[in-house]
């Protein structure tokens, strides 16, 4: 749909009229496109003569001639004046009433939107959509009227201008769509506005991805409406959420033909006099000229001292007396369109909202961020570099990683650089730039002319610029200039860079201008670019800003491979390195208890954990010990850099999470304060900036302050320093046998070290068999080759397995961080082993649907290699080429930068295994971030996520989410994995498991059928599919699937256990017992399947009354695994049913200590034991808790977010009825001595007080159990008498048939003996069944040389599986598990 015409009689004057048409700028986008929205009352605008105040804006247009008149009293942008139009005005309804403030802000918002439209580059797709023929005609006239040969200014269409005038009011819901009816607005304009509101509503939708929403808008809305809504959304800047900003940015990119923003292109084509106007307007606010485009992080352009209170001594004086929005230039920065070339800087805390002098702001921590157009030159800013350079200590300007120079007056651009924490970005071959400290140099490639680049559609590329001031006292080091360069910079004619003019060095000039803003003591600058890998022109400009100047190709490769890992994992992200420093009387200590006087630096990858108990919080890296915290108060905090992925550029912020343990909802003791604001357990992450203060606990005994660092800490260097590998290297050089024995490790010889270096697989196996010797070898190897990522990964996996809680797990996290750091730095990646390549081929379906003869070898660059799994089945022993045995660090010379592979399979494996480690430590948020980072790295493979090994990472992630009950998280992970790995069988099985848990059986069956089509023998599939069919009611098909599974996998005890459960649920107890016995003969005592088989079999036998066999199974299992919660719960149940209540209570307490208080089975069993003891108050309290936990699990299974389910759980436990139960239970616990009088102290039960004393001796459940036992005894006695009578009859018949005499007597005795053990002659009832295994070897039984294994089943057990006659007993569930009556509540 094209632009719709507007009636020619309509003319709109927008300004401060005598009656005041009022609207207001809204800071969030909430779409109001429905008629049911609340309507606001309006006051109409009289067509009288308008009156303008200072700074007011007038926008008028005449529809007949399509002329636009835009004037701004205080501003730097002026459109060509037009003759004032004549004609009628828009007659607004008189029922509308707005305030004066709303009117002013609406006028300003509309003028900015019209300015954004007029700045669209002539001929661009956006200009064609929003201006059209009218805009082209007026632009032509404007071009002839204006001076110099500048680009014509496009003019909005009349209907677009009318819609722009009304869109702010509709967005802010001052007007509803229904208010447009009545004839006062043209129907075409009203339709355009409706579609624009639909686009706004799509931007706030969180049920679909951003790309899907953008596609929907492109398909269902007209292009002019989408373009108008996108420009309006981009104008909102920091007022919108990050997801909405990403939506509007992508929509603009789609509408603009995939190129850069037309507004930036228009800014690039402006004339020098227009830049002079902008510069004069900027200097009025005391700012240095620079372009700011990245609106998502425009908030960092504000002063961090004024954004938060109580951050430093300088900011404490002002407190909250001033705010960012109170500054005029700050408010302008927030309200400006992101595509406009704005000028932004932070206000000084002492400015108090007043205009300051031109120059840098002394109180700004973060100065600006922005997108630097490739063809815009800020030549006037280059001259400010030398003028504003400080002279600290009598020397020249000093910047950490920043060097800018230039001379004004000659118009020649000068070179300046921003160095990223001592590292440099990748550059194209043949580039050169001015040398920066920490980087090399190389000749600069001759760039293409500006016209050619514009024709190629590359007007600008996104980049982000971050300037920070980490320390107010330390002086930065002096910059390093290249040889032969003068201290005051290059010559003004640009001789230092031949062939480059001012137009080609625009990004350098912008960086020099930005560096001048930080002129002052301690003013280093960090630059991080957000560029695509195939964007050559943008990377060329970004590499100059990153200080990646290189002198030759060899040094270029070495510099690119030795970059600091602290920022390489955050390439494309803006972040500020920080550390945590103690400001209280209690010092911060490391995991070993040693004080940290310099604080604890926050690494850019992974979390750090601070707590006061390393046993409760494994992996604690910072100990808090004040010796005054009450017992039971477990304080812990997690700090981690989090990337906001909802925004295209990925904002990065250091966030704090309160992960303390709460006991009985005592949240006050676990509260934390960030700048005086409380952060409770379970709250979302709180973003932190330098200067923030953190206090712990109710007494605030621990206090810390965040300080910025000049560069991010390196995980590799920190690990080498903490592990003292340099000392091992020096000692090994002096002594051939090394000094491993000094640290308690065995001595290793040089031959062992050489053998381990040549065979990495044997070293990985040794890490499992002999961890001390493997650690000694790893120390020796890493002392010689600290950059070998495979060695670090083997050590990290070994530490995660063998190290205990506390310092051990913190050491494992440090090793994983070093492995990831080393993997990023490796110049040459070895090819993955053949096993990993074959696994990747199976994941991509190459072995089933592609040509069978495809090569399975990988090239040396690692692009064809893939990681198969991220769990224990794929460890770092695959880091060495099995054919050559060469180490990654032993490669012959680094390759050229262009030869470095995009996909790093070692990094995928390091991040994936690190995520596993964090998940085991219950750091679920950190584990999710690491899984996501591993999947993103795997997706860089040329074959996609599946070929890069990401499918295994996503499968492990989804499986852990499903085990935790997070069905919605698991569904999201499985859906994404299936989209990217459509031929992975394991992912289809995972999706079926998720839908089975959510009770979507038909969908689960569909996933099972897809997986079966890919692989007909998958073991995991046969664990899920029969359960799905049984849930759908097809029992025969479920049994058939189990039989097929056992035919394909006869030794799989998981399948056997699942089959036995199915038979037990169907009532086939004999078949279930046979299957349980078969599984235990294969795997009797393993901690996984063996324990579950025993627990399930013992539970079934207990329900059937065969307590002897159940006790035998449980005692054997508990002897091997005394802390198994599953066995302890069944054992408690058995003791309870037999009347031994104290033993049952002790067993269930042990189970609760292992499984926790949120295990429904454990807590339900404890409630049953307490009810059997007669403790009604305690039982009712636990029953309430169990019902709340079950409701929590049901909500998670139904697809609710975990936060929603927990919120409902908390609300359910805070009702008056529940509080009454809790109070009664606590009073009785105090009476029994099970709870201390003072919370936090250890309970001291009085002597002689036992649970159940003085109460009913037997609960109703016990009485029912005794009645059941009596009926079973009577039944056995009746069967015994019947068997004896039958035996006598058979004996008499045998004697009569033999004809009497001795032969008859012998036959009668034989018949009697046979009948006594026959089908009706046994003492216990029915005839036993033959459960002898014909071929034990077939089922994997290790017979050895001795007799067959002892049988688990006996003949007398058969009576519990078959009941030929009914004894009129109630169901077992009704007998064993009575519901609580009115007395229990």
From Swiss-Prot:
Acidic residues biased stretches: 1356-1365
Keyword Repeat carried by entry: yes
GO molecular function: mRNA binding
GO biological process, one term: mRNA processing
Protein name stated in the entry: PsbD mRNA maturation factor Nac2, chloroplastic
Segments for region (Disordered): 132-157, 263-282, 304-360, 387-502, 546-568, 726-756, 840-899, 1237-1257, 1333-1385
Residue stretches of biased makeup (Basic and acidic residues): 271-281, 1374-1385
Record-linked Gene3D superfamilies: Tetratricopeptide repeat domain (1.25.40.10)
The keyword Mitochondrion is assigned to this record: no
Annotated localization: Plastid, Chloroplast stroma
Pfam families linked to this entry: TPR_16 (PF13432)
